[in-house]
Amino acid sequence: MSSIITLLTYYWLIIFSIIGYGLLFNKIFLRSESQNLGFIGIYGIFSLLLISYISSFFLPHTQIFNLVILSLGLINFFINKVIFDKELKKLIFIFGFLIIFIFISKNHDDFSYYHFPYTHLLTEYSGIIGLGNFTHGFKTSSSIFYLSSPVSYTHLTLPTTPYV
């Protein structure tokens, strides 16, 4: 039971961190005061993807890196939380409902073939280029791998649920 509570807490922290990065992206690059939480979430995912793509050449996405990335997004979220308190209630309701589907879903059939190994390599090593020569599954890297590596919870002792 405690592992499910830990997992749920981590999911909420990831969501709030993504929104924090979206707010930062919106403020710096778009110079907009938009309060549309959907667009801010997309901006946050884009920001995390950009950070992940660039940092994977220089740093492995270790526990410390993930903690720093998560913390920076959370700090920015809590600094700017007042901007959209009404939208925040909608987010909590919608994500609270959708989290049910996360728990009843199953892994894709090729998760153990290349989804998990590629994400695991991103968390262990930096500058991994040419992995397509080793196995067919690594020839085309997906942005999902790079999005899941900075928010992976490999440092937590949880049951084997690969959802991030």
Roles of regions detected by a PLM:
Residues 1-84:
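Membrane-embedded, hydrophobic transmembrane alpha-helices
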Residues 1-3, 142-153:
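Juxtamembrane membrane-water interface segments that cap and precede transmembrane helices
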Residues 7-14, 60-66, 110-113, 135-142, ...:
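Membrane-interface micro-motifs in multi-pass membrane enzymes
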Residues 76, 87-110:
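Transmembrane signal-anchor helices characteristic of membrane glycosylation enzymes that use polyprenol
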Residues 105-118, 124-147:
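Extracytoplasmic catalytic/substrate-binding loops of multi-pass membrane glycan-assembly enzymes
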Residues 154-160:
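Conserved small/polar residues in nucleotide/adenosyl-binding loops
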Residues 164:
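Cytosolic catalytic cores of cyclic-nucleotide second-messenger enzymes
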